[in-house]
Amino acid sequence: MNSLFASTARGLEELLKTELEGLGATDCQVVQGGVHFQGDTRLLYQSLMWSRLASRIMLPLGECRVYSDLDLYLGVQAIPWTEMFNPGATFAVHFSGLNDEIRNSQYGALKVKDAIVDSFTRKNLPRPNVDRESPDLRINVWLNKETAHISLDLSGEGLHLRGYRDGTGMAPIKENLAAAIVMRSGWVPGTPLLDPMCGSGTLLIEAAMLATDRAPGLHRGHWGFGGWAQHDDAIWKEVKAEAQTRARQGLAAYESRFYGSDVDARVIERARRNARRAGIGELIDFDVKDVAQLNNPLPKGPYGTVISNPPYGERLESEPALIALHSLLGRIMKSQFGGWNLSVFSASPELLSCLQLRADKQFKAKNGPLDCVQKNYHLAESEGGKPAMLAEDFANRLRKNLKKFEKWARQEGIECYRLYDADLPEYNVAIDRYADWVVVQEYAPPKTVDAHKARQRLFDIIAATIAVLDMAPNKLVLKTRERQKGKNQYQKMAEKGDFIEVQEYNARLWVNLTDYLDTGLFLDHRIARRMLGQMSKGKDFLNLFSYTGSASVHAGLGGARSTTTVDMSRTYLEWAERNLRLNGLTGRAHRLMQADVLGWLRESTEQFDLIFIDPPTFSNSKRMEDAFDVQRDHIRLMTDLKRLLRKGGTIMFSNNKRGFRMDHDGLAALGLKAQEISQKTLSQDFARNRQIHNCWLITAA
């Protein structure tokens, strides 16, 4: 009997134990990452040929204590290597694990290689050559603390490499994990199996091989026992011949079908090639189809199983499309696949909840470094018609707001407006529309809120928003924002450079929904900008802390004699120039100046009839001479502004500080007075948030 070890992906150990016992293995002991077992020579070869779950089959050769590199060398050399190698066999060493003495796996592998080679040269035998790519023997050494475990890897390459796959689509799963997913799915061979996002077909191919009794090792061309002196070629040929016979018989007897579809035609063609190479191509119907086009291929029965490993993104921007995809899949399952079973494997439990189905069973497994879950569902026969929507109370409020604001915005001639502003406290997001795009902004929840629940609620919001607005998921932009402090307000998020053109009254403006936390257009200032346009005819207009210059555009379109746009950011000034140019406002009459606004104010001697200033609440930018606090410093600001204001001129002063208190006495000392117009500048879509900004008209007293 041989003592053997089968490694596998984390989470599959018990399943592998059951499989090995079915092959005839004895004394199976589960450990993390694999199973120790006993078996004769035939069982050794059968485990290599037939295990669908094992990553590798190892023959342990010995172990040694390692307190120095010499201990490792001597421990390896104690193994009778000359009795293990066929003459002329090549080998490679795979070394994993580190300790205080062996701190580099390459160094460890080199010591093992030296010990093996020296075992031959000391007996005056030809030294074996190393072949890292395709060796006849693979030596595996695992250093765990002070103990090195030395094994012969009889698999050669990993057993997941069945020999049928020439390439993969994005984010593949290994074949042995795919086999485990099939085994755990609840699917019964002989019944239909459908994968609506099949990629290169791995799940369906593994299922078809299982159903037709086709050994997973049948198509492999290289093994790890070719140079092993104890290899019994006669028994190996018997095992292989038996597998070939069973595969022929299994294929001939199998009557059910498999169905696979994917939106990518190139991936589907690859799946067809893979299935043909695996010998079961005639059993699988592959089709180029989006999930939205999915239908039941057997509406009159029999019932089957839908199995899938849908995409799951790790980038925030991919989530809206993935949420919509899972929500859509759930609706289609309920409406078209009543009586079927569904099994979905994913690294995102939150996305699975968008299916709106209750799982009967669930399993955990690792896909490489990712913690994954597989959930099985039964779709009741009565489930049909229109399913309930996620976050129904939120969806109802959004519908109500849409009905109200859509008509109003059309009448006003605006394409950008707020649809939802944390109307329901438990759905704490803002939803803004920019033409046919939508931005969902979630404030980062407090630490007291469970992160998983907060993320789940956000997913519900996105799914409901896409459904209510009947919009393309790729036109929804998701942003999570913390309460902004100073310069963080304008932090860079990405480098896409995607601008879209929108209308605001008679102005055309560029917005960018992805590259920055803000979009280039503060929607709550819309009415203030229109007022500036109405006040600007024949006047010299100054726009300070100008951001992307939208106020300058309105002033220019309102007939201003000149506009001067000042901001410290070159990026935003270039954006402002694009906005002005889009509206035909070019030439010397429309100046753009990059400067520290506070420093520029102190030094400028120019005069203006109308000044708009919307300073940050607080700023301590390195490029500004002093830290700025709008509450503390607004009178100092007005002192400089008064010097630039022509007789009879007006300052529109706005800021976003909640609880801002105007220093009327300080203004009076300057000979100025302030009229608050905050409520006049608040449009319908911001009526719920009356403190979003405060706005003042300041003139001579």
UniProtKB/Swiss-Prot annotation:
Protein name according to UniProt: Ribosomal RNA large subunit methyltransferase K/L
Organism lineage string: Bacteria, Pseudomonadati, Pseudomonadota, Gammaproteobacteria, Enterobacterales
UniProt subcellular location: Cytoplasm
Species of origin: Klebsiella pneumoniae subsp. pneumoniae (strain ATCC 700721 / MGH 78578)
Keywords noted in UniProt: Cytoplasm, Methyltransferase, RNA-binding, rRNA processing, S-adenosyl-L-methionine, Transferase
Described function: Specifically methylates the guanine in position 2445 (m2G2445) and the guanine in position 2069 (m7G2069) of 23S rRNA.
Pfam families on file: Methyltrans_SAM, RlmL_1st, THUMP, UPF0020
Reaction equations catalysed: guanosine(2445) in 23S rRNA + S-adenosyl-L-methionine = N(2)-methylguanosine(2445) in 23S rRNA + S-adenosyl-L-homocysteine + H(+); guanosine(2069) in 23S rRNA + S-adenosyl-L-methionine = N(2)-methylguanosine(2069) in 23S rRNA + S-adenosyl-L-homocysteine + H(+)
Molecular-function annotations in GO: 23S rRNA (guanine(2445)-N(2))-methyltransferase activity; RNA binding; rRNA (guanine-N7-)-methyltransferase activity
EC number: 2.1.1.173, 2.1.1.264
A cellular component annotation (GO) from this entry: cytoplasm
Residue ranges of domain THUMP in the record: 43-154
Domain of life per record: Bacteria
Enzyme class name: transferase
InterPro entries: 23SrRNA_methyltr_KL (IPR017244), DNA_methylase_N6_adenine_CS (IPR002052), RlmKL-like_Mtase (IPR000241), RlmKL-like_Mtase_CS (IPR053943), RlmL_1st (IPR054170), SAM-dep_methyl-trfase (IPR019614), SAM-dependent_MTases_sf (IPR029063), THUMP_dom (IPR004114)
Family: Belongs to the methyltransferase superfamily. RlmKL family.
